[in-house]
Amino acid sequence: MDSNTVSSFQDILMRMSKMQLGSSSEDLNGMITQFESLKLYRDSLEEAVMRMGDLHSLQNRNGKWREQLSQKFEEIRWLIEEVRHRLKITENSFEQITFMQALQLLLEVEQEIRTFSFQLI
């Protein structure tokens, strides 16, 4: 993962952890957890691509990796919709900036995961 993407994940996770969204803080914690999970998954795909011979290992280790990939895309789409919803309802500029950056990062990571997965197919 390039250093910009790593710092973007770290920055957004830090910003989200500082937000207090009242009754929806449980939802925010869920979003943070999914962001962290997405980062780990993206990193593991990148590592597999870097070691192209690792495709067989990836398939052997997880025979359902395509299903897992599909699930990650569903999670990304859910996060994108959740972030868009938060953008519409928040009036706090700190939160707006954070969610705009989160949305941009999600779109970038979705594209990276697509690129990695096509290289693995």
Swiss-Prot record:
Keyword Transport in record: yes
Residues spanned by motif Nuclear export signal: 12-21, 85-94
Database matches in InterPro entries: Flu_NS2
SUPFAM superfamilies in the cross-refs: Nonstructural protein ns2, Nep, M1-binding domain
Annotated keywords: Host nucleus, Host-virus interaction, Transport, Virion
GO terms classed as biological process: exit of virus from host cell nucleus through nuclear pore
Domain of life: Viruses
Places the protein is found: Virion; Host nucleus
Keyword Cell division annotated: no
One GO CC term on file: host cell nucleus
Pfam families assigned: Flu_NS2
Functional note: Mediates the nuclear export of encapsidated genomic RNAs (ribonucleoproteins, RNPs). Acts as an adapter between viral RNPs complexes and the nuclear export machinery of the cell. Possesses no intrinsic RNA-binding activity, but includes a C-terminal M1-binding domain. This domain is believed to allow recognition of RNPs bound to the protein M1.
UniProt record similarity statement: Belongs to the influenza viruses NEP family.
HAMAP family, per database record: INFV_NEP
Subunit structure: Interacts with protein M1. May interact with host nucleoporin RAB/HRB and exportin XPO1/CRM1.
Protein name (Swiss-Prot/TrEMBL): Nuclear export protein
Source species of the chain: Influenza A virus (strain A/Duck/Czechoslovakia/1956 H4N6)
